[in-house]
Amino acid sequence: MHHLKSPKNVSSVCFLQSARDCARLTGQTLHTMELFRPLRNIWNRAREYARAAISAAGISWMSRHVYRYPTLMLRNLGARQPATQNWPLYLYPPPHFLIGYQYVVRVCNDYVFETRAYSRLVYRETVRLDQQIVDWSTMANCSYTINAGAYHRFIDLENFDETLRQIQQAVLAERVVADLALIQPLRGFGRTEMADLPPQRRNVPVERFLQEQCMNLGECQDQAWGFANRIRIQQAGRRDLIILTTIRRLRCAYFNFLLSHPPPNRNNTERASPMLSLPCDCDWLEAFVQRFSDPVDAQSLRFETAASTERVVAHVIDALSLPQPAARPLTELRGGAFELRPREHGRAVTQEMRIRRGEMVQRFIESLPLPTRRRRVARPAPPSPSPSPEPVELEMPPLEGEEEEEEEELPPRSFAEEVRAAVAEVIRLLQEELTVSARNEQFFNFAVDFYEAINMLEREGNINESTIRRWVIYFFIVEHIATTLNYLHHHLRLSPVFARHVELNLGQVVMRARDEDGAVIYSRVWNEPGTNAFSQLMRRISTDLAATVHRAGRGELDEEEIERFMTDIAYRDHSGDVEEIIRQAELNDASINSVDLSFRFKVTGPVAFTQHPEIQRINRRVVQHASDLRQQLQPMPELNDPVQLPPLRPERQRPPLGPRRPL
């Protein structure tokens, strides 16, 4: 007789998944969390815990004075680990874990912030029918300073065309590439303070605490979630890094291709050398990228032929907008670094390029060293049972008063337009190969806003020292903001495990401009609530600062100009002092020496309770002894002090739960 195996218990599967998520978000090993046995809802199980361990007020007291959760949560809290030897853990994990707290600290620590500060942990209790839970929340404030004086020296007002060409190399490089490559060099840089600690102990060696969990790889192996997660991100990032680097090279090559041609209506018989004959074969795109991508030879690309700022800016906007359609039609480009044969195999050159485009694009993508590339396989069409005859189309005569419609033929593309179409197709397909996290382009569209601002200055004839200085400074400020917000969005919103358990409540960016003496000249504040705070902040800041550029050098604004300016920057209530905003618009930016950028965000996450009876029993004894010390006005022991716990006294009977008696 055969016995059928019963299916796995659904609750056990959910429990293991919860323990796995908790391990990733606390930096602990899976073994530690399975020993801890996390529980979110303690409804009808409150009697298993000490009274102080289940209320928001009690956990707040334990967190700040007894267990010191702000720093304890950063340690290796596995059984019999050095941090758990004596007071207050006694060889076991703590009675609570703040799910996601260690992850937030790690994310902030891994970026190039000069200072990191965390507000006091706040606990909120929710008790309703069938639910009793506790949440923790904190506000992180991470900041660093930009040396604006360096940007002043960067500007060459006598040769602004050359300055623009230098800027575009950094713009087209897409800071997201550097962001994904930011793995080791700047980790742990700067200072970290926690408000829950006494002043003399607020400077916390976070990096040392976080690395303690990964010191013995032979012991923890892939269960050291903090370390393994970093390795996993690094490995996944290499593939995205190759794709993003290729996209950058394509955009740079296309921009340099546009610059390589003399401006319209200029007779220039000098030709660049060497010549490149197109379409020499199906793989002309590879030769195109090798010829025009950085590093480039300015002389061979004839940068001196770029006649006007407007032309350079238009080319930058065109390259930045790839793979979207061009904002303005391209004029036919002749000469330059290409020798265009009028016909090949009986077809026009542009027609041949268009016909071969799909094959050429596919070969170019296949040539990239992408690990485990997801190849697209066309699905075969389902076989039809019998061939159906083709329907016969009858030509219907036009109705009375109706004119015959003539077939519209699309106008033939110029050579430059066909080059753009091929480059755009490659970029579009490569973007589809990116992971979701690396596909966040909403943070890097700010460059288009700023180049449109330059276009407006050019049309108004307002290119002067004040507007150019502000444009350059604000451009690089927004570049910093975009890179940082994208980093935070990547880790705090696009991480599935973190987003599933921890909520982003608020995002805020504060910008303070200082003079040479360190005095604040003006400050700006942008706030956005909700889970999409970072992307909404980026959109507002880009629009705001780009709209402020053309107000530079105009002195005091009258009432009508102020109203128009507030409309241009899409001002919202509670987004900074209006007088500060007006002062920023009227300021001479030459007095700005440095700019402080602060990134603040508030998160709320769950408190997990232990279900392990021994951890609950130790916690009762620790709470009892700590309460006695508080009543006797004695200081609390330090972590791992060899304190002998007194025996547990019986607790007073709790009144049974039921309806409250009327007063």
UniProtKB/Swiss-Prot annotation:
Subcellular locations according to the entry: Host nucleus matrix
Predominant subcellular localization, coarse grouping: host cell
Feature: compositional bias, Pro residues: 380-390
TM annotation in the entry: none
Acidic residues bias spans: 400-409
Modified residues (O-(5'-phospho-DNA)-serine): 575
Protein name (Swiss-Prot/TrEMBL): Preterminal protein
Protein source organism: Bovine adenovirus B serotype 3 (BAdV-3)
The organism's taxonomic lineage, starting at the top: Viruses, Varidnaviria, Bamfordvirae, Preplasmiviricota, Tectiliviricetes
